[in-house]
């Protein structure tokens, strides 16, 4: 027998996974696919159909993602308690089950209040998935320091994989829903995403259990003042506020520019593919930069990605159709390659500058700041788009916010982490 008397029956599987950090990171990355892509990013694929079907204003459509972000903020604020009470691995898996259920239930309603409530609940539970997974991947990366950047990159690249899954599933379900005569064809997509989320949760269960995590400790003297990393935190707030406008409304803007469903799907897949390979693109930078430089670079690139569609929505008649298409694909490629790494950059900053006993608390702070930015972003972009020149103006404002975030993050210098 290979098991000790107090080992669970599955300990051989878990022990094997503990010796396979890359495979473990891939399993954990499904949490990013679920908590970020299915729960949050997929909504952009529903926006054009829901707007056409329900006649909602951009403000109302944006408010659905604001509700999701509010739930995410509440989940982030309670994250330390949840992880202390249930452990990172359990909160990761339980959050995955609940998030999947709430996603599926979105297909049962057409009232904005009901859908908004479910978006709030899915945001609340997805915080345990995404941020809980962040704690797990930080522990895994700490145990394998020579591959730290790669492991962090793999985890956050799960968002790209999830985007590809969404791009393949949601348009297909919209077509099938229409062919089957459903009154609201987009509802089928929510059912399928819920089922997909449950499958992902099952697949990430064992990898999450294989990461050895000591219970988080809370002491009165073991803390680092937030002012020490206020600049990168402010830059991360701007990231949350700026990126979400693009993510919420890019498909609606492309539809306004005359793109058909096939082109929209190809564009979204492009973002997902670049996100999937962002681990290889950014792994060295995540290991090299100890301060806010990585986030500053990413915010700058994301701002450029926002400016491109904003510019062509205002002045597209001055360029040929092919030029517009190529530039928009460049925008999507930049956005996909940078999106997940912005989050990874803050995790890397925490790992580089804080002792392990402070990781949960610091991740909670960064997640809460990020979520606050996400609350403001979609509704602001939607309101501007309804009242001040359309989606183009909203995208330009998002770019300005991201440029400000880049400047703030650049000011952040590393500091010597005390011994754990």
What are these regions (language model features)?
Residues 43-44, 228-269, 273-276:
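Extracytoplasmic gate region of multi-pass secondary transporters
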Residues 74-110:
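Conserved MFS/SLC helix-loop-helix module at the cytosolic interface between two early adjacent transmembrane helices
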Residues 75-87, 278-291, 385-386:
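Helix-to-loop junctions at the C-terminal end of transmembrane segments
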Residues 102, 113-122, 326-334:
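Paired small-residue
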Residues 118-158:
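Cytoplasmic helix-loop-helix junction between adjacent transmembrane helices
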Residues 170-171, 194-214, 408-412:
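C-terminal membrane-cytosol helix-exit motif in multi-pass small-molecule transporters
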Residues 292-346:
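C-terminal transmembrane helical hairpin of 12-TM major facilitator-type secondary transporters
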Residues 351-388:
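A late C-terminal transmembrane helix in Major Facilitator Superfamily
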